[in-house]
């Protein structure tokens, strides 16, 4: 055969390590490189690709061979062609990457023949392969069966019964979950605080309003209301009225949302009502005022610990306003607690919002009877303690706004500090 009978080499895809050469004739006619093509061509092909795909075009059949070019031991021939399997082909019936039980136990390399590996055949031992696929399928089936097993919802008093109207109590196996409900393993237990009745009634895949959603107390305060919507760690229920299983979500904990802003609003409301307007209405007592000031300052200190909310300007402004409410009540009380000269004091004086603070019950301070001077000393020390705590709180807020370069908030804090200095003098 002459080189003119050989078509130009056509490269296979870049992912393969082969080149293809089409020629006319029968593949058995070429047993060496001299019968195929010149040595220079073979060297060029061998330098580019490791394998050569030889396609024999005949009148009867289309045969394809994969050959490996190797150096020939014959001195007269540079290369020889050896028939080989395609590099991307896998031996049919071979259990690749699966060793027999005996080779696994001895930790030796297994050839993996289906009828028996060479090691077991040589030693005349039974060769068995582990059925990994079957075991995985079996485990998957067991998981599916476990997921559809019986689940019970129980509270602290006992198990939570599930009844279908008109049929009495049913087991989990009798309930058809395929159409409406998807059993969830995480719904094994529920707290009694989440349920308003002792049992859940299923009537045509619907839940009555007396059980779900949960009943909410009518006089619930702002803090509980907001934390119930955002920030609560209670689990959410799936929708029993959904028509398909895709819309029924598993019970999962809601993503936590910080509720410090709601707590700050509640603290602001409490300070406005009990520290400002109660004094104007002459309904505040001195001990209640001191306790309210202490609680308000403690709430603000806890709110400053939230690393997320202190980055919000509105949150910091709200805390500054709360400090202003506390400072105002301290200023009013401090004016009343100062010693007065009965001669120089005017006979008529406009009533201050905190004048009712001096209506003190001796038993509220001590069981022993105290005169007016002792009462002023005790109350003065308590108010001085409130001023000290308030000064520390304002200093912490000042560092916060200075670090973030909030100029307006800085001026507000400095105004509060100047008012605190006036109380000390």
Swiss-Prot record:
Residues 100-127 bind DNA. One of its GO terms (molecular function) is DNA-binding transcription factor activity, RNA polymerase II-specific. Residues 133-157 have a biased composition (Polar residues). One of its GO terms (cellular component) is nucleus. It comes from the Eukaryota. The keyword Zinc applies. Keywords: DNA-binding, Metal-binding, Nucleus, Transcription, Transcription regulation, Zinc. SUPFAM superfamilies: Zn2/Cys6 DNA-binding domain. It is found in: Nucleus. Pfam families: AflR (PF08493). Its main location: nucleus. Residues 132-159 are annotated as: Disordered. Gene3D superfamilies: Zn(2)-C6 fungal-type DNA-binding domain. GO terms for biological process: aflatoxin biosynthetic process. InterPro entries: AflR, Zn2-C6_fun-type_DNA-bd_sf, Zn2Cys6_DnaBD. Transcription factor involved in regulation of gene cluster that mediates the biosynthesis of aphidicolin. This is Aspyridones cluster regulator. It comes from Neocamarosporium betae. The gene is TF.
């Amino acid at each position: 055969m002459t080189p003119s009978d050989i078509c130009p080499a056509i490269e296979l895809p870049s992912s393969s390590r082969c080149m293809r050469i089409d020629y006319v004739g029968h593949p058995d006619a070429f047993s060496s490189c001299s019968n195929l093509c010149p040595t220079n061509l073979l060297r060029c092909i061998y330098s580019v690709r490791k394998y050569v795909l030889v396609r024999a075009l005949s009148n009867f059949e289309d045969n394809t061979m994969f050959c490996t070019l190797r150096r020939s031991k014959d001195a007269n021939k540079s290369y020889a062609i050896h028939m080989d399997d395609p590099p991307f082909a896998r031996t049919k019936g071979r259990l690749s990457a699966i060793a027999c039980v005996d080779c696994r136990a001895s930790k030796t390399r297994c050839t993996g023949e289906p009828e028996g590996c060479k090691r077991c055949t040589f030693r005349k031992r039974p060769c068995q392969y582990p059925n990994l696929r079957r075991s995985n399928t079996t485990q998957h089936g067991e998981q599916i069966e476990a997921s559809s097993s019986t689940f019970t919802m129980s509270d602290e008093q006992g198990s939570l019964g599930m009844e279908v109207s008109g049929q009495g109590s049913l087991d989990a196996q009798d309930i058809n979950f395929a159409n409406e409900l998807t059993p969830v393993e995480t719904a094994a237990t529920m707290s009694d605080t989440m349920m308003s009745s002792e049992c859940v009634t299923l009537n045509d895949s619907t839940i009555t309003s007396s059980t779900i959603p949960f009943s909410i107390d009518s006089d619930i305060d702002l803090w509980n209301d907001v934390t119930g919507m955002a920030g609560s760690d209670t689990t959410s229920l799936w929708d029993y009225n959904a028509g398909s299983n895709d819309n029924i979500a598993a019970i999962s904990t809601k993503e936590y949302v910080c509720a410090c802003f709601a707590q700050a609003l509640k603290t602001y409301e409490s300070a406005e009502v009990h520290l400002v307007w109660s004094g104007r209405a002459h309904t505040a007592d001195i001990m209640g005022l001191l306790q309210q000031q202490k609680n308000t300052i403690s709430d603000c200190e806890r709110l400053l610990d939230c690393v997320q909310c202190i980055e919000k300007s509105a949150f910091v402004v709200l805390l500054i306003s709360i400090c202003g409410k506390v400072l105002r009540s301290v200023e009013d009380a401090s004016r009343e607690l100062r010693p007065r000269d009965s001669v120089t004091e005017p006979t008529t004086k406009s009533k201050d919002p905190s004048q009712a603070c001096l209506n003190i019950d001796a038993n509220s301070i001590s069981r022993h009877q105290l005169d007016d001077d002792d009462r002023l000393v005790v109350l003065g020390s308590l108010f001085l303690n409130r001023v000290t705590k308030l000064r520390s709180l304002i200093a912490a807020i000042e560092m916060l706004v200075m670090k973030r370069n909030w100029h307006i908030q800085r001026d507000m804090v400095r105004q509060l500090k100047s008012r605190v200095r006036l109380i000390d003098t």
